[in-house]
């Protein structure tokens, strides 16, 4: 959480200034206390998010973190930064992690360089026992993904406690962004009794009116 908070603090304002949606999702089930190198993780994520903002004119930037594997007191996490930006061809994407490589000169002139070298990011990820790759398509956006191994730390106290009364609540999620609805729905799983999602205020009003009197929102 500290890493995500730091990254969003540094980058969210830039996204909002361009009118972009900025979303971050940490999947349920990840241990609350992890030991690793938060500075390096933060630098890599910040670099990827800044690049995503730079090369995206409309749409959204989305950070996703999920657990891939757990072996004893070690967990492998997967970090993804997705954008709806200009994207690139497979040929250019394959060269992007080479030293001093940019997608092409026209892109560099319009949007600027990619900040902290992607070659450096790859080396840092490999030092942390992980891998790094990207998926991209021209005009459809880019997703940078990397994995790292972290140690599970000792949790202080009993962790998050969910009051029993919340498990009987029926929640209604209202957001015009499908990705945001998905993230909020995932966060509410195991917290409230039921969560439904709609895309507009009109749909929300209709859902509230149609709700059973014995199970209101």
Question: Model-found features: residue ranges?
Answer:
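Disordered, acidic interdomain junction associated with two-component signaling
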Residues: 6, 17, 25, 68-78, ...
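Short alpha-helical Gxxx[C/S/T] motif in the catalytic ATP-binding
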Residues: 112, 117, 121, 174
């Amino acid at each position: 959480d500290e890493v995500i908070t730091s990254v969003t603090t540094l980058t969210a304002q830039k996204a909002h200034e361009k009118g972009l949606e900025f979303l971050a999702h940490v999947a349920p089930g990840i241990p609350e206390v992890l030991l690793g190198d938060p500075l390096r993780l933060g630098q890599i994520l910040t670099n990827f998010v800044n690049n995503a903002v730079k090369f995206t004119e409309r749409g959204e930037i989305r950070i996703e973190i999920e657990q891939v594997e757990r072996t004893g007191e070690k967990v492998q996490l997967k970090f993804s930064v997705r954008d709806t930006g200009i994207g690139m061809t497979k040929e250019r994407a394959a060269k992007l992690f080479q030293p001093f490589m940019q997608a092409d000169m026209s892109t560099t002139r319009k949007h600027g360089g990619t900040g902290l070298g992607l070659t450096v990011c790859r080396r840092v990820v490999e030092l942390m026992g992980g891998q790094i790759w990207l998926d991209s398509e021209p005009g459809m956006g880019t997703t940078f993904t990397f994995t790292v191994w972290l140690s599970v730390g000792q949790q202080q106290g009993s962790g998050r406690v969910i009051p029993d009364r919340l498990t009987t609540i029926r929640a209604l999620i209202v957001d015009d962004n499908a990705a945001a609805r998905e993230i909020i729905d995932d966060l509410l799983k195991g917290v409230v009794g039921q969560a439904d999602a709609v895309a507009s205020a009109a749909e929300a009003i209709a859902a509230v009116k149609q709700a059973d009197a014995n199970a209101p929102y």
